[in-house]
Structures are given as structure tokens and as C-alpha cells.
Amino acid sequence: MMGLRLKILSWWTPTWVISRELDHVFQVTTAALKSLLAAHALEIQTKRSDEKSKPKTIEQKRASMAAEHAMLVEALATSIGPEEALRLGREALFRVGKQLGMANRGKLGVGSNPMDLIRAATILYRVLGIEFNIERSDKKRATLIVHRCALSQHYSEVTCRVLSATDEGVVKGLNPHVNMAFTEVLTSGCSKCRAQIEFEN
């Protein structure tokens, strides 16, 4: 039954599921960044929106989340320097991503085979407005190529590299025997994002 859920949602994901999962990703990623800022005695004043001004559509929610990410990462970089912000931000967001991956592995019934990982990634990237494909090199290596990212227009390169650690953590959470690391990102001027994937067995 769980494997069937994974297959169905990878083919078609209802809007309400995308909206719910997007809200959750928004919550946990911004909470991690705010916690980092608080640890460095920084308090960021965020705008409190009333019900009328809250983002309602999927596109609005993605844009709002990305703008919040950018503001928080830039504030951290201004305070402690971009290199330290990158290091600490990636560590924190990798942990968040791994937890998200583990939770979705259970909910979706993700097995150990590569196809299950690709199906789960399809669902999660659909939530974020990211279009991608996978190119296999051999049994142990593959490349993830992102053609479109709804978040990239709101991100600086530093923000993008911090938040990409979430994706890397998600993959590790979905399958503990798989590692992913981004080598190219759209925000650095590349035409596509690329991440190297390695299968341990």
C-alpha cells in the first residue's frame, strides 16, 4: 500500500498535498535559520501579515518562502561573514533535510532501490517548483540536473548553496546509502543546477 502511494503521488500530486508540504518545509527551514541567528544574538524583525495578505497560491507561497530564506541567510552572512554563514547554514539545513527525508521515507514507503528515490524526489521537488532529470553514469553514480527552479530568482548564490544542503540531507534521509552534493547552481550563472549522486552499494 505504501509503495502504491509513492507511485501514485509521483505521477500526480494533488494541490492540497503540495500546499501542505510546502507550508511544512517553509516552517522547518526558516525555523532552523532563525535559530542560527538567535544563537549569534541576532533578532530579525519579520513582517506580520494579516489573513488577507498571507500567500494563498502555491506560487505565492514558494516566493514568500524563498524571500524569507534570502533575508535570513543574508542577515547571517552580514553578521558573521559569508563563509561562516555558509558553513553553519549548510550544517543546520542538512540536518533539517535529513529529518524531512526520513519522515517522507516512512510516509511514502520508500524502499532501497534507486527508482523509489527518484519517485520520492519527484514528489518533493514538485512541491518546491523544481523540474529535474537524472542521468545515470553507472551503477554507483548519477547526476541530478535541475532545468527549472521556482526559488532561484529570489536567491543569491550564498542563499542557494545554504538551502541546497536541505536537498542533500533529504536524499540521505530517503536512503542512508546514497550521497548527493551540488557542484553547480543556477544562481552562480550556470544554465542548470547539477548534483553528483553516489550509491554506496
Predicted region positions:
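N-terminal accessory segment detector
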Residues: 1-140, 150-162, 166, 177-192, ...
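Surface-exposed, gly/pro-biased binding rims or lids
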Residues: 174
